[in-house]
């Protein structure tokens, strides 16, 4: 039985909710085929985010870690391909930090690739008619910071990890101009995503690239 740790960020940037946290809370204790989900709430704070998830990993000893965050402007669930060693925050985090062009980890490598089967994930969600596509940038805010930091922590461990961005909820789109996804569909998608990771020790060879 695989243990799947799924994490979600608290609200930030003036929002009262974060779909990542709302979705993972619904998945707490969910039984999968060959696995079970446990969850962790993550502060949107530069240093505490990594420490919080590392502590959860040490507590739960998971086989798989899936970190989740919201991405305004995206219409699909987007597993991230790569984390980069750059903090360049457009807005302050919830602790008031706003680094500019600073490394996530001093003397760390330029980037880490996900160890989740992102092509298998997109295939599984497409079969369920849930919008999903591979993303090649996790940004330079706390999402990328956490993605990079946890990949660095797990670099010599057998635990698989990757970051997934999800769309806003309809109630977050006050202007009516942003793409959104219902919480029910996000929850369904994340459950299928976790199952795809359990089912695929290695990724499948299908195209998911972009021209630019």
From Swiss-Prot:
Known catalytic reactions: Release of an N-terminal pyroglutamyl group from a polypeptide, the second amino acid generally not being Pro
Cell compartment(s), UniProt: Cytoplasm
Assigned EC number: 3.4.19.3
PROSITE patterns: PYRASE_CYS, PYRASE_GLU
KW Iron-sulfur (keyword) present: no
Any one Gene Ontology molecular-function term assigned to this protein's record: pyroglutamyl-peptidase activity
Any one Gene Ontology BP term: proteolysis
Active site annotation, chain numbering: 80, 143, 165
Enzyme superclass (EC): hydrolase
Leader sequence segment: none
UniProt superkingdom: Bacteria
Free-text function comment from the UniProt entry: Removes 5-oxoproline from various penultimate amino acid residues except L-proline.
Family classification: Belongs to the peptidase C15 family.
Quaternary structure annotation from Swiss-Prot or TrEMBL: Homotetramer.
Protein name, entry field: Pyrrolidone-carboxylate peptidase
Source species: Vibrio campbellii (strain ATCC BAA-1116)
Gene responsible for this protein: pcp
């Amino acid at each position: 039985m695989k243990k799947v740790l799924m994490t979600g960020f608290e609200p930030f940037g003036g929002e009262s909710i974060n779909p990542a946290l709302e979705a993972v809370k619904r998945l707490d204790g969910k039984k999968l085929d060959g696995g079970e989900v446990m969850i962790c709430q993550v502060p949107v704070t530069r240093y505490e985010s990594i420490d919080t998830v590392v502590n959860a990993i040490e507590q739960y000893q998971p086989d798989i870690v899936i970190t989740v965050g919201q991405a305004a402007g995206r219409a699909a669930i987007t597993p991230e391909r790569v984390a980069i060693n750059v903090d360049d925050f457009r807005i302050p985090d919830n602790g008031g930090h706003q680094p500019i062009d600073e490394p996530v980890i001093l003397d760390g490598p330029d980037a880490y690739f996900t160890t989740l089967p992102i092509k298998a994930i997109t295939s599984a969600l497409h079969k369920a008619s849930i919008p999903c596509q591979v993303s090649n940038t996790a940004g330079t805010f706390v999402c990328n910071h956490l993605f990079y930091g946890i990949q660095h922590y797990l670099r010599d461990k057998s635990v698989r990890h990757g970051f997934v961005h999800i769309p806003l909820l309809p109630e977050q789109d006050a202007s009516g101009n942003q793409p959104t996804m219902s919480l029910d569909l996000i929850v369904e998608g994340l459950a299928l995503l976790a199952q795809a990771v359990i089912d695929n020790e290695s990724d499948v060879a299908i195209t998911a690239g972009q021209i630019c």
